[in-house]
Amino acid sequence: MRLQFPEGFLLGVSSASAQIEGGEVGSNWNDWYHQGRIKDDSDPAVADDHWNRWREDCALMAGLHLPIARMGVEWARIMPARGEIDETAIAHYRAELEYMRQLGIRPLLTIHHFSNPMWFERLGGFSKRENLDDFLSFAKLCADRFGDLVSDWITINEPNVYATNGYFFGDWPPGHKSFSETLTVLENMAFCHIRCYQMLHATREAMGYSDTMVGFANHLRVFEPENPKNPMQAATARAVEWLFQGAITQAMSTGVFRLPLKNHWKLPKGEYCDFHGVNYYTRSTVTGFADGVRKNSPRNDLGWEIYPDGLPQVAAKLEKLLKRPIWVTENGTCDNQDAFRARYIYEHLHAMLRSGLPFERYYHWCFCDNFEWLEGESARFGLINVDYATQTRTIKRSGEFYADMIRNDGVTDEAYNTYVRGEVYRVE
């Protein structure tokens, strides 16, 4: 055996409703497309048409022998107007969740994954404290309607990416460029997570369940100075890491708000995650307050460095913050020809499992090629190829490798030689 998985270790896949479902649902990403802001002009109303093909996609998951899968629900579908509930949408999601369970797939449900209804966006979204009850009402509705089918929950996906891209750099909706507003959004999302954590446990406990697991998925990367001997660059790297991921991770995990975040609600210190959710993709080199990529490093098709050792590095910091099991809630790569994805997956799993850290789950991003936010459909991360003209699904070579790992509870020598050996990264 080339790589043996520890007992109980699970492999799964991740997806997000706005990236796969399709449909003109009145979300901020539908609006962003109509403003002409998607690089390849892909329309999220098309995406993978998962809303109409969910049975086919769930059957594909079962065909890969997946025991777990992460999915989301689209707020704009469930609440198309403020205070309005679409019971048809709720019934649709319940049917999908029930079918997953029938197939032996345990769902991990994400409540918020970058997508807002436009009515919420027009009110100021998460930048306005008076709007937070709207999100908390949606979260409570999810708990009430799906709590009997879902034990594992992610409250908010990548609050740091949502806030910085939408409110600091202005590349994502709503397109603002304000440091103070970015901090406000982060503070408000931390508040929402803590309230959701408490609510989800209370709601499911009232239903008679004691197996609730709640966390959040944060985007974590390694920040290193371009020149390790340069003290200014080293200090800047530490500052960027804290501003981008350290402060928000601590606030949401423990209720401890430290600069630049403030605890305006006087929330009590506590423990507000049952697992550490890690979304890891790359390492960034730092000279100033902008990302860089180390020279002569392996890169994916978006130019991101491929750095497997960074995954246990970021996870180790979470372990020091709070002793919890670690779930890799996203890890994957843009590989449009599926030329090195199997190697990428193998090397990240190898780095994780040799670390000795309490990794319990690995959710590959993503299940099938999808609408990859600003990049559109041109950036392919999936184990399943999607022909967007016909919506035909085809299992990629990397998907076959993934299924083989699940069947064998690890990577056999034969699988390594068949799928991993010979795959080569592009180096720049």
Regions found by a protein language model. Give the residues of each.
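Non-catalytic scaffold segments within catalytic domains of secreted glycoside hydrolases
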Residues: 1-54, 58, 62-67, 76-428
